[in-house]
Curated annotation (Swiss-Prot):
Source domain of life: Bacteria
Name of the protein in its database record: Small ribosomal subunit protein uS14A
Subunit structure: Part of the 30S ribosomal subunit. Contacts proteins S3 and S10.
Provenance organism: Listeria monocytogenes serotype 4b (strain F2365)
Its job: Binds 16S rRNA, required for the assembly of 30S particles and may also be responsible for determining the conformation of the 16S rRNA at the A site.
């Protein structure tokens, strides 16, 4: 489990990215880079790092499922992930 402060920071950053998304898009399209520079630093989507939805873990993130590899394995073994089966060959 990630630190609560890191998870909270990530949520704040996501909110800022969503809040400024349309403004950033229009400023970029119009080439108004000075105004773009004045926006909050955390409003840039490139500063976000994918985190597990369940635990907040930043590493081992599986983009297709939105969770970390550890939680993926646990949920797959329990049969909680539809369409996921253990491989055998």
């Amino acid at each position: 489990m990630a630190k609560k402060s890191k998870v909270a920071k990530h949520e704040r950053q996501q909110a800022l990215v969503e809040q400024y998304a349309e403004l950033r898009r229009t400023l970029k399209a119009e080439g108004r880079y000075d105004e773009l520079r004045k926006l909050p630093r955390d409003s840039s989507p490139s500063r976000l790092h994918n985190r597990c939805e369940l635990t907040g873990r930043p590493h081992g993130y599986m983009r297709k499922f939105g969770i970390s590899r550890i939680r993926f394995r646990e949920l797959a073994h329990q049969g909680q992930l539809p369409g996921v089966t253990k491989a055998s060959w």
